[in-house]
Amino acid sequence: MDGNLFSSIMKAFLKGIDIKSDQVQDEVEIPIDDALIEELKTIVANSKAIALGFYYDEKNKLRLNTNKCISYLRKIAEFIIKHGVLMIYNQKEGIFQELNDELIGTILRYLMNTAIPNSWKKVYERDIIDGLIREVPRVDTNIIDDTLISFNNGVYNVVTKQLLPHDKKYMFTNKSPIDYLKEADCPIFKKAIKEITCNDDELLSCLQEIFGNALINNTKAERAFFFTGVGSNGKSFCSEVLTEIVGVNNVSNIQLSKFSERFGIEGIVSKTLNIANENELGGAISTENLKALISGDTINISRKFKQAINYKSTIKLIFLLNTLPDTLDNTHGYYRKILIVPFNRVFKSEDIDRKLKEKVCTELSGVLNWCLEGAERLINNDYNFTESKAVEKVTKAYKEEQNPVEAYLNEVLVYEEGSSETKKAVLDAYKSWIEGEGISARGTDSPQRFRRSLNNSTKINLNCELTYKKIAGTLYLRDFKIDYSKLPKQEVKYTFSN
């Protein structure tokens, strides 16, 4: 078989699927006549047919040994299975790509019909696909070197800062469509980002690290990102540019509200980044799947008309929100896994450059370098994002809104060693305070929810556990006192000391 010819044909029709030559032939100029050429063609065709597994049975009927055909395919191409999906190595692109029914059918039809005209039958395909699935190696996400990032023109090592050639040994199934060019810059983009972040260097550095984190093949940062703000503030611009850097085909757009639905997160499989624009959220979000994906835990994903899979992802999650989502999960674990980025700059209509994205798309290799700078700083800082006062402010406000008990602890309930308040007085003061402040209790005014929320908030903010003492059958909360001046109606109360 002329593997080089076949490879060139496949590259033209199948976007670069590589087929290896079975043998290397020296180019020798030998004058031969047309009859000999036809005879050689027949010999080559017969050789192809035999290699593919074709044979004639005792009744002289053409048959196909599918096991032999599978062995032949594995000799001329590289296959793997990842996340339950059969994939073939595309040497032109430098990544493994899904070998869907249409693609395998095109390859088999070409091979069979060039060996024996009109020999292809669709019935062969299912047996061959099933055989490949049972034979080819399975690839786990964990075996991919997380110091490597696949770009259009090579594989970048974030430690050595070297660009390596694409190679199937890296097992990449995604890559950025952008070329890495060491000296490339992006002055237009940098100017826009400074304006979007209101010249806040801390916030800009944090945003740069978020962009860089989207390229890294691990979840060590363990964060999802809420881009929040109303009006024309740059959220969409940032998401569109990051999508260009990561690659449109590598980005899903599943909304936060879908994460609790049965088939809601099916679309994240094999994706690098999820960016979703969500203007309104109907109710409190469920955080179970969200936190599992943020941490890179293995989760079970239901798929329509397919078998469910256990999936371990390195996907990064970004949500564009006008208002932050309500949640019943007020644990430290939830707030530790989200990073809220405020977009406070509101651009007037006359200040908006309608062609800004188009201009930035001419300097994407420079934007890529800007992202890599953020990725390298994040890695060197042990995956901790640059602290930002703007981020801290919006996060504090969100936590207090979602968990009014925490705001009560900060405003009304004062830590003071030796003091104590009755358990009932602490809850009554809380109810009085939220009523006076016009704050929704969000169910925290029940004794059990209140006590649990207060204990969580005390652990997070004061690094201590609540302790109680019983006096004459009455429970007292130790080492706290109520600041009655913060309540709507001041009443004379007695505080007991040990």
Give residue spans per PLM region:
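A short, contiguous, amphipathic alpha-helix enriched in charged residues
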Residues: 61-69, 198, 243-248, 283-299, ...
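Replication-associated primase and helicase/ATPase modules
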Residues: 1-70, 74-75, 182-191, 195, ...
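Intein modules and their embedded homing endonuclease domains
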Residues: 19-177, 442-445
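Phosphate-handling catalytic cores of nucleic-acid transaction enzymes
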Residues: 364-402
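Conserved nucleotide-sensing/catalytic segment adjacent to the nucleotide-binding pocket
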Residues: 264-306
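Positively charged interface segments
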Residues: 9, 13-16, 74-75, 119, ...
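Loop/turn-to-beta-strand initiation segments
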Residues: 270-273, 313-317
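P-loop NTPase catalytic core of nucleic-acid-dependent motor ATPases
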Residues: 6, 11-16, 22, 77-102, ...
